[in-house]
A protein has these predicted regions:
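Beta1-alpha1 glycine-rich phosphate/pyrophosphate-binding loop at the start
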Residues: 2-76, 81, 155-159
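FAD-binding core/adjacent interface of flavoenzyme oxidoreductases
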Residues: 2-4, 73-158
Length: 159
């Protein structure tokens, strides 16, 4: 059999995972997933994590477990630092990886449309950490509101 083509997929969101699942069926490819986290999570349910209805473990699944049955997939936890197209390599904070094909599946970034005060004050909810931060802020404000001596203070904490 010919040598496997090296495919590096940076980003383990829906797009990256779906591509990897399709490519993994073809043994001509050896696939490396690079992601900053060692788990995939289901963003549509982040609001339930932030409201304490479910725990983060209910919406996250380890990449290594997801692909443990596949011999042509490996996981590299790290952050993309640099792409070297001439050398067909990428550099991460945890080493250099060679590729024949590179897929950048990095997701989205919130656009605050230049409103720095909104960016500073907002409680975003795009990651599990952000959902937990929102949850903790909500719970702390509710606790503080129960001890507030004035209605205006209670309203400020609850709105």
């Amino acid at each position: 059999m010919a040598e496997q083509k090296k495919v590096v997929v940076v980003g383990g969101g829906f797009a990256g995972i779906n591509l990897i699942k399709k490519l993994a069926k073809d043994k001509r490819f050896h696939i490396t997933l690079v992601d900053i986290h060692n788990y995939h999570f289901f963003p549509p349910l982040l609001y339930q994590v932030s409201t304490a209805f479910i725990e983060p473990s209910n919406i996250s699944y380890p990449f290594r477990r997801m692909f443990q049955e596949k011999e042509n997939i490996r996981f590299h936890m790290g952050t993309l630092q640099k792409v070297n197209p001439e050398a067909n390599t990428i550099e991460t904070n945890n080493g250099t990886l060679a590729y024949d094909y590179l897929v950048l599946s990095l997701g989205t970034e919130t656009n605050y449309f230049g409103m720095e005060n909104v960016k500073r004050s907002a409680l975003p909810m795009k990651t599990i950490d952000e959902a937990l931060n929102l949850r903790n802020t909500l719970l702390l404000n509710m606790e503080k509101a129960t001890r507030a001596k004035h209605k205006a203070e209670r309203d400020r904490l609850l709105n």
